[in-house]
Amino acid sequence: MKSTSSGAFPPVPSQITIPVYAVTMAQTGETKIPASTPFYYAAISAIWVHFRVDPKVAQALLPRGLEVAVFDGAALASVHFMNALAQYGIGSPGNATTLPSPGGSVFNETEINIVALPSARAAAAPALTIEQFLAGGDQTKLLGNFRVWVACDDAVAVAAGKALYFENKILTSYGFNIPAMNNAGQSEYAWTCFENLTTTEVYSAKVDLAGLAALPANVSEWIDYSFDAEAQRPVASRRNYFGIFSSYDISNAQSAVAIAWGTSTLQMLTDMQALFGTAAPIAVQTFASPTVIAEAGPYYADV
């Protein structure tokens, strides 16, 4: 059939219409999947908002065996939001009752972190400034993020985080609009954490880095701390980001970040309010994994 256009390229709309579904899911049982460690992320986009906080308040949120890292009299805590993709290599048709049905999952989560180290190794703690630490200066790898709370919107990721990494992990929901290769023109990071499948907000955040200069940071490998409540021992794992972070000093541009508390009754919100209080953010870091495929726009092949 002859083309109705005399040009080389088909008309491509600026927006397309896609279906919207209301999806509900009830647990019908359980299944087994490989307890894979290391756990591999196929793709990730992440942002950290860092705060100087009161060491005494931070220490009160740490479990037995961990103590807060102190930088020039302050502790360092962060709100870490991520969009991630994991491929499990196991799938089943459609909306099957066996998870993970599509062979993978896209999950979004918040980690509320306090930089800490094992009490048993406190004497070996490096003397660093916050700026040195965020640039990747801790070569001892004793300093790491204790995950006070992890709030995730994927039930499989919640179960795996608890079983494999002893995370204090809960199921929540998210709405967000963040920079991405397929979200052209979006420069602001904006996200809201809700109590699971409700409109009750836990917290919301907006980060606008426009006009701010970024420095490269070699943060990996990143140490994550959790706690084995049964053994009453701290647990560590090492997370490698295969790339460079972008690090922003916002100590003189604190209006770049806005975080608002919701009305949730979850203990997570109570702890966030106690930890961060009215503290102003001092730094932001971002990381995005490289794009692996790009399919260019269409053109008429008969020219």
Placement of each model-derived feature along the sequence:
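N-terminal ordered "arm"
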Residues: I33-H80
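Interaction-surface and assembly-scaffold signal
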Residues: S3-K32, V150-V303
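Arginine residue identity/basic-tract feature
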Residues: R52, R64, H80, R121, ...
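Functionally constrained cores in energy, signaling, and assembly domains
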Residues: A58, A116, L266
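A generic "folded-domain core" signal
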Residues: G7-Y21, A26-G29, R64-A116, V284
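Aromatic- and glycine-enriched beta-alpha-beta binding-site module
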Residues: Q87-T199
